[in-house]
C-alpha cells in the first residue's frame, strides 16, 4: 500500500475535524474552555511564535487550530505543506 501526501492530508483533516467536535462538546459543557485553555495550549504545541513555517511535528496542531477557526483548511493546501516538508527533510 502506498500512502500519498493527498491521503495523509485527508487523514490529518479528518482527525482534526473529529478533535474539533470533541472541543466543541467541551465548550458546550464548560463555557470558555476553548479560548481560555485549549487554544492557547494548541498554539504552544504548534510553535506558532517560534516557527513561522510549520514542521512535520507542528503540522497536526496547526491543522486542528485551522479547523477550529472560521476558515476550514482545504486538503490541497495541507497536501502542499506535506510535500514541501517531506522534500525539505530528504537526506542530501
Stretches found by the model and what they are:
Residues 1-7, 41-46:
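Short amphipathic alpha-helical segments and their helix-coil junctions
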Residues 2-30:
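Long amphipathic alpha-helical coiled-coil
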Residues 19-55:
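Amphipathic alpha-helical interaction modules
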Amino acid at each position: 500500500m502506498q500512502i500519498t501526501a493527498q491521503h495523509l492530508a485527508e487523514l490529518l483533516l479528518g482527525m482534526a475535524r473529529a478533535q474539533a467536535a470533541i472541543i466543541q462538546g467541551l465548550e458546550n459543557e464548560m463555557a470558555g474552555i476553548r479560548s481560555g485553555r485549549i487554544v492557547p495550549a494548541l498554539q504552544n504545541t504548534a510553535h506558532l511564535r517560534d516557527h513561522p513555517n510549520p514542521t512535520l511535528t507542528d503540522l497536526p496542531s496547526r491543522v486542528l487550530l485551522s479547523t477550529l477557526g472560521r476558515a476550514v483548511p482545504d486538503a490541497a493546501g495541507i497536501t502542499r505543506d506535506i510535500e514541501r516538508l517531506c522534500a525539505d527533510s530528504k537526506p542530501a
